[in-house]
Curated annotation (Swiss-Prot):
Heme b b566 binds at H97, H196. It is found in: Mitochondrion inner membrane. This is Cytochrome b. Component of the ubiquinol-cytochrome c reductase complex (complex III or cytochrome b-c1 complex) that is part of the mitochondrial respiratory chain. The b-c1 complex mediates electron transfer from ubiquinol to cytochrome c. Contributes to the generation of a proton gradient across the mitochondrial membrane that is then used for ATP synthesis. Keywords: Electron transport, Heme, Iron, Membrane, Metal-binding, Mitochondrion, Mitochondrion inner membrane, Respiratory chain, Transmembrane, Transmembrane helix, Transport, Ubiquinone. InterPro entries: Cyt_b/b6_C, Cyt_b/b6_C_sf, Cyt_b/b6_N, Cytb/b6-like_sf, Cytochrome_b, Cytochrome_b_C_euk/bac, Cytochrome_b_N_euk/bac, Di-haem_cyt_TM. PROSITE patterns: CYTB_CTER, CYTB_NTER. The keyword Secreted does not apply. Heme b b562 binds at H83, H182. It comes from Mungos mungo. Its cofactor is heme b.
Amino acid sequence: MTNIRKSHPLIKIINESFIDLPAPSNISAWWNFGSLLGACLILQILTGLFVAMHYTSDTTTAFSSVTHICRDVNYGWIIRYMHANGASMFFICLFMHIGRGMYYGSYSFMETWNIGIILLFTVMATAFMGYVLPWGQMSFWGATVITNLLSAVPYIGTNLVEWIWGGFSVDKATLTRFFAFHFILPFVISALAAVHLLFLHETGSNNPSGIPSDSDKIPFHPYYTIKDMLGLLIMFTALMTLVLFSPDLLGDPDNYTPANPLNTPPHIKPEWYFLFAYAILRSIPYKLGGVLALILSITILAIVPLLHTSNQRSMMFRPLSQCLFWLLAADLLTLTWIGGQPVEYPFIIIGQLASILYFLIILVLMPISGIIENHLLKW
C-alpha cells in the first residue's frame, strides 16, 4: 500500500513542500527567516482576528475600543500587544530575509524575488493601515501625512487623495475602509506567500556558497523542521520578552492621546520599520522628488538582479562586496535613526548623505565591486 502522504492529493502537496523536499545540506540559520515569516503571518492573523472581535472602526469609539480591549477583555492586553509587537518581529524577519537574499545572490531566482517584492509592498501597506486603527494622535497624523503624499501625483493627485480619504480629510470613511483593507490584506499576503513558495520549489533553495547543490541534497524533515523549530523558539522568546516586559518600547507615546485634528504633534513619524524610507522621503526638499525617492527606495530591489556583474552568485568569497553590503546595512540603520529625529541641523545633512549613499551603493558601487572582483580572480 502506498504511503498516504505520497498518494493523497492534498497531503502530497504538503509532503512535497515540507517533508520530502530536497534541501541543500549546507544552508545556515539565515535560511530560517522564511519559516519565521510564515509563523509571524499566522500569529498576526490569529491575534488580529481576536482583536477585531472587540474593535470598532468608528472615529468616536475606535480609541475607546482599544482601551476596552486592554482593560476589560480577558487577556485582551496580551493579544493586543502580541499583535502590535508581532508586526515589529515580522519586519525584523523581513529585513533579515531580504538581506540574506542580497548577500547570497538569491535574487537570481527572478520570479521568487519579484513576488517577494510584491509581498514586501503588501505587508508595508497592511502595517501602515494597522497603525491608523487605534485612532491615536500619531495614527491620525501619520495617515494624513502619508496619504497626502499622493497629492504629488501630477494632475490627478488631489482627486486621488480625496478618493482614498472618502471625503475632504482623514475621517470616519477613511478609518472604516482602512479597517476593511487591514482585515483582508493578510489573506492576500498568505496567497502571495504560497505563490512565492511555489516558485521557490520550482528551482530549489540557494545555499551560502551560491553554487548548485543538486548533487548534495537532504530531506527537509527532520533536518530543517527541527532547525526551524529552534528559530521559532528564539523568535517567540524575543517577542514574548518584548510583550511582557516593555510592550510600548517600539510604539509612540503620542498614540496614547486620542486623535485630534486641531492639534498637530510636534514631530510626526511612522512606526520604526518605515523610518528608513521616511528619512529618504524627507531628505529631498521637493515633494514629488521625495515621493519618487521613497518609492524607488523599495522598487530598487527589483533591479538588483540586473545590476549583478560578478561571476560568482554569492558574496561568500567576495570581500569587497561584503564590505559594501555591511556599509549598506549600517547606512539603513543610520537612516532609521534619522527618520525618528526632528528636521533640523545636523540631522538634515546626515539624512541627505545617508540617502545618497544608499542609492550609490546599490546602483554604482556594488556593480563596480563585482567587476573589480572578476578581474582580481584572473590575476
